[in-house]
Every structure is written in structure tokens, then in C-alpha cells.
Amino acid sequence: MTEQNRRAVLLEAEEAVCSDRNADYGDPEDNFLDIAQLWTAYKNVPFTRADVAVFMTLVKIARMKTSPKVKDHYVDIAGYAACGYPSALADAE
């Protein structure tokens, strides 16, 4: 059952970040850049796309304190990790 649960979380995250999500939200790296630019303007502190992936993961971790059994938190964290790596690569360009 445990392996099945792990697989389910990863498959759901894959579906979220590798499917038609771009049609609704645009490319994740472009979306993270938009968010980083807004945060930078709001806080007057430089943020990167990779920062967005990390901070959104932290939002999910904070929510897990209240509701640790909500599968969506784990799925989203896996998705942010998957988008974070190419975001970090794009930041380095």
C-alpha cells in the first residue's frame, strides 16, 4: 500500500505539471518568472524563479501543519520540485 501511495502522488504531480496545465497557466518557468518579478517589486528584494518554487513548497509545508493527511499538499510539493529544477536552470542562463 505504501508504494502504491507513493506512486499515486508522483503520477498525480506528473499529470499536473506535464499535461495541458500550460493552456491554463502558461509555461511554469514563465509563470514563476512573472511571480518572481511581482514579489521583487512588492518587497524590493530580488526573487528568482527557483525562489518561487521553494517558497510555494514552504506554503504547502505550512498548510501541512494543520492538515497533514491532505494528499494535495504532497502532490503540489512534488510538482513544485519538478518545476523548480528547470526554473533554477533558466535562472542561471
PLM regions and their residue ranges:
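Intrinsically disordered, low-complexity regulatory regions
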Residues: 1-93
